């Protein structure tokens, strides 16, 4: 797999306060990487760095040449007083034909929404339209910030299934910020646990056993996910039907105290 984005000892400071400390990571073509961490851990800042919206204070950021990034924001604020249907919304970021818009919407199962009012979409419908907008660019890297926020449980399952299918269809990298721990563990290749620095990173099966993960998310999260692993690993497959890997995990032993996840 080839690296699309590489961070080496990257730091970001605001008013002498270090928000990101010595971050080293890679986003690879064809892989889903999920970022987790408590509120105020620097997750949004890291996303901005990768999108090119925040300059690092120090360290190195390397992106593949001509890298195309599709971005699905956590929240989309639209002026309620301005009528805006889906096809007009999709064309705000560029000029696309009706067929191109239909094709993108069809990929996410939302072609029937092309003439719908953006203000009347459900949480799940809204996320699918945002995903379609990102796919219009045929991205090499898809960045999703809390993609399942405001979506019901079944909608979350469907959305993560969709993201996984998009990864395979486009052979793109996916970088996702999420707090839906159960669903994340089933659908991701790698997990990065962030609390200003990288506390631990690696495969889902090993990350949940690490003391840094337990310190951030508590024993309840570990026990709940232990049940998830027991329920699925005895079949040697995760929820997506893929074999469970035993990849090694790289972790650092920092004491964080107990925090609630966002």
UniProtKB/Swiss-Prot annotation:
SUPFAM superfamilies: P-loop containing nucleoside triphosphate hydrolases. The keyword Translocase applies. It is found in: Cell inner membrane. It is a peripheral membrane protein. Part of the ABC transporter complex ZnuABC involved in zinc import. Responsible for energy coupling to the transport system. This is Zinc import ATP-binding protein ZnuC. Belongs to the ABC transporter superfamily. Zinc importer (TC 3.A.1.15.5) family. It comes from Vibrio parahaemolyticus serotype O3:K6 (strain RIMD 2210633). Keywords: ATP-binding, Cell inner membrane, Cell membrane, Ion transport, Membrane, Nucleotide-binding, Translocase, Transport, Zinc, Zinc transport. Its main location: membrane. PROSITE patterns: ABC_TRANSPORTER_2 (PS50893), ZNUC (PS51298). ATP binds at residues 37-44.
